[in-house]
Amino acid sequence: MNRQRLLKIWCLKKLGETHRCYSSAGDPTKLINFSEFTPEKIRNFGIVAHVDHGKSTLADRLLELCGAVPPGQQQMLDKLQVERERGITVKAQTAALKYQGYLLNLIDTPGHVDFSAEVSRSLAVCDGILLLVAANQGVQAQTIANFWLAFEKNIQIIPVINKIDLPGADIKSVETQLKNLFEFNSEECLHISAKSGLNVEKVLDAIVERVPAPTANVEAPFRAMIFDSYFDHFRGAIAHIVVKEGSVKKGDKIRSYQNDKSYDVSEVGVMRPEMVKCTEVRAGQVGYLVCNMRTVKEAVVGETLFAAETPKESVQSFAEIKGVKATVYAGLFPVETADYESLKQAVERLCLNDPSVTVTPDASKALGLGWRIGFLGVLHMEVFGARLSQEYDASVILCQPSVEYRAKIKDNENIRKKRYDGMEEVRILDPSKFPEESDVDSFLEPMVKVRMIVPNEMMGTVNGLCSECRGERGEISSIDTSRLMILWRLPLAEVAVDFFERLKKLTSGYASFDYEPDGWQETRLVKLTILINGKEVSEFSQILPAAMARDRAKTLVQRLKREIPRQQFEVTIKACIGSSTKALSQIVIQPMKRDFSQLLKGNFGGGGMERLNKKLSHQKKGKERMKMVGNIQIPKEAFLNVLKN
């Protein structure tokens, strides 16, 4: 099969259908010219799937078959170091492919639920998608979520069953699942092996035949939408665009709709999958544009770019790409306070490439200036931290994540006006701003609707986990003869941190899950405070539902015991609720003792024992005084290790 594929690539190259092109900035005649591809000859499509169903492998085979990369290359569209290390797709990537007289613009998307915003943003560019399902795993939770994302946008969906050459592949079962869940007939499903290349040519043919051409007008003045962007240290913000009308080339003058700024275009091109300069990017095509945008706020996702000579009043801006609301929040601080400014710049630039992140300034007595950052999940948070380290060489502290809560303030004008700026409902993200319980009618916590696909025999185990997480059971439906789809309504606080890890452990990795926001629910919130020798250390305070307080208290106290060095006096660590001094969990770190028997050289005769007891008595009284007035030495590393995720 590999020899046949290589032979086909060689023949296509001979016929001039496909070729790898390189450009020279100094010679315009050597730039790639895509003007031959009218909108009717363009197909913009994406690949969506659950994690580990073969998206990146299929993308590699498509790149090979279209001559964009040499055979044998792997993870060509996973360009970030964190993607290659973890084996997951984090950022959607594009590639322009030539195939039998057509220009196919491929958008590869992530599969993890934490990066659903990337999928949603990519679908704004696509006219069709490949819905990839592994034959040995079947339809999973994220498969269903991705289908409905595309269905709601009225995008053509092509079902593709991958990994058909594996011993555990069950093609008939997967076809039944696709029929029952999405009403796909078996004739619509393509059967492939992305790893070996089996039947991948049929995927390209199906894209040409089934995906509609983009709606575009080449004759109209230039108008395009930014669907992604990133910051280059030398060229500024580089915008990935889909051109809806007209064309753009080097030297053109363009304007942005929201910022109302004018720019001179210095470079245009396409991704193949690396950046390749072109003579122009025309209506219907997907490419990139460089125009000396020097601040990260100028290349926001969803921005409309148009020809500078076109009156702004006559330009129709594109519908805003809806952002996905953050689900978890965590403090982010530089390890060294002197690095604050450089880290601030790195955070701003990375947020340009990841607009789903929300940033607000924060400060800590122990850690200095920093930010409270909102993420779409814990994996999203970990990847953000890894990218700061790998791409910007930044050393950061990411604190324990939490979720947003709300408080309904009592209907009392004095309370609302004096303490809460007249608001009836306040957001709670920071423990230091936790409202007085006497001011609050009720607390609210965010809820999510969780969709899980589990083997039949593990339903009881999974239901037990969800009940333990304060959940409400929903519908149960059959996927096939061996698997069930279970719906539960759970508090986001239970899901956001370690629910998936616990689910995988209980089901030996056979379960998958996806979740979506499902309103708010009344709860009893508490502020967990840490007292060290009776003094509150605000950096360790946390807000959480009362049902989770005892377990979290034990964890924090144990961490602190490991991190705080022994002192000359006894140190008592207590975890309490609010201003109460009653401990949920308590540990005592015993003091260091001075061995007076060594000083007295073991000579206890002639009153030696009395002298020893006298010394020990003096030591005890001295330590009592130190405990009352002394400051406990808590090293900065203790804050880092206790607060970090």
From Swiss-Prot:
Binding, GTP: 49-56, 108-112, 162-165
Localization: Mitochondrion inner membrane
Domain tr-type G: 40-215
GO CC entries: mitochondrial inner membrane; mitochondrial matrix; mitochondrion
CDD domains given in the database record: EF4_II (cd03699), EF4_III (cd16260), LepA (cd01890), lepA_C (cd03709)
Record's catalysed reaction(s): GTP + H2O = GDP + phosphate + H(+)
A Pfam cross-reference name: GTP_EFTU_D2
GO molecular function ontology, one term from the record: GTPase activity
Main location group: mitochondrion
GO biological process: positive regulation of translation; translation
Function (record text): Promotes mitochondrial protein synthesis. May act as a fidelity factor of the translation reaction, by catalyzing a one-codon backward translocation of tRNAs on improperly translocated ribosomes. Binds to mitochondrial ribosomes in a GTP-dependent manner.
Family, similarity comment: Belongs to the TRAFAC class translation factor GTPase superfamily. Classic translation factor GTPase family. LepA subfamily.
Protein name, as recorded: Translation factor GUF1 homolog, mitochondrial
Source organism per UniProt: Caenorhabditis briggsae
